[in-house]
């Protein structure tokens, strides 16, 4: 059975054959469901807890 991944930024499930795997210089893997998530994390350094469309925002707010 093929396992699904979870987006490192928004927490959304990524289906097999989709998404983007980013490898940092230290060897750690980051999985992204879209370029929106990739750019928000790596280029713009946004905090996912402050964005309403992420799952971590829903977990941080009561």
UniProtKB/Swiss-Prot annotation:
Keywords: Metal-binding, Ribonucleoprotein, Ribosomal protein, RNA-binding, rRNA-binding, Zinc, Zinc-finger
Domain of life: Archaea
Coiled coil (UniProt feature): none
Name of the featured protein: Large ribosomal subunit protein eL24
Known partners and oligomeric status: Part of the 50S ribosomal subunit. Forms a cluster with proteins L3 and L14.
PROSITE patterns in the record: RIBOSOMAL_L24E
Zn finger (C4-type) start-end: 7-37
Organism: Sulfolobus acidocaldarius (strain ATCC 33909 / DSM 639 / JCM 8929 / NBRC 15157 / NCIMB 11770)
């Amino acid at each position: 059975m093929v396992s699904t991944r979870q987006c490192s930024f928004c927490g959304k499930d990524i289906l097999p054959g989709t998404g983007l795997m980013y490898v940092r210089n230290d060897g750690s893997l980051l999985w992204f469901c879209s370029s929106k998530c990739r750019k928000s994390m790596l280029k713009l350094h946004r905090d996912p807890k402050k964005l309403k469309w992420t799952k971590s925002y829903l977990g941080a707010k009561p």
